[in-house]
Structure formats: structure tokens, C-alpha cells
């Protein structure tokens, strides 16, 4: 009879969630394996058993952040309107950031000094940009957007979305400004700037 698994996927997810919280709220100095284990009510042995050490934990954290983000983007079914699909991707981008703010900083900043993800993890992270590029390609292909390099259009759209979400999560919005109404309009305005006239 095999021994029961004591360090399961649920514990792994709790450790990754807490590691992301520590990094995003207290910085890299707060993330020790001992503290992480204590915060999740487990042992450092469990952390080593699941991840092998801090470098692998950080890589797994980066991978998990992009996996969740990518899963949310991939869950959007395509419609026959690629521009509307782009708007919807932008809305999911914000929803994902608000659902997992502890991962947003891990994904899009240098919160972990001297961290370089593994080549496989980095490639998986880059794949999350593909739904936007693909929808831009559809919009260019059907004549809704001007003929321009797809990655340039996608970068401009991402910049709007990323900038507003970063301002919101970092608490840098002007007092009293409600982001939700401005957010979708900003994405639409950027998309309209690429429309074929």
C-alpha cells in the first residue's frame, strides 16, 4: 500500500499564494522559506519536498502567476468580432490582476532581485501575449484595423491596459477617480485609433 501524500497540490497552491503576498506587500526580504512555511502552517521540509529550494519556488511562483493569467485569457471564447474580443481580453486582464494582485507584481516587475525564470517558464509566460496578438491579426486580416505590424498594435493596447491596472493596484490613482468606467473607454479609444477609416 503506497504512503499517503502529505504534501499535496492544495498545499503547493497555498505556499505559492502566500509567497506572492509576501513579495508584493513586504518585498523580497520577507520571503524566507522558514517564514513561508510558518505562515501556511506547514514545515520547511514540506517546502523543500514540493519545490526543492527557494530558486525553484520562485520559478514555480512565476509560472503559477502566468498560468492563472493565461487560463483566464484562454477561457474567453472567440466571437466573430476581433475588436470586441480585444476589449474583452483587456477586461479579463484587469479582472485577473484584481483576483490575484499578489501575482501581478511577480509577473510584471522586478520584485525578485536577480531572478531569471527558467527558459520553459519564460516561454509559457510569453504565450500569454498570444491571444492579444492573434486577435489583432484577425482585426487586421478582416480589414477592421489598419495594416500595421500585429505586435506593435498589440503592444500599444497592452500598454494602455497594463498602465491603468498598475496605477490601480499600486494605489496611484488620483483621489476620487473611479477607474472602471474609464478603463473600458480607454481600451476602446486605443482600439479605435487602429481602425481602418
Where are these regions (language model features)?
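Amphipathic C-terminal alpha-helical segment
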Residues: 96, 134, 138, 158-176, ...
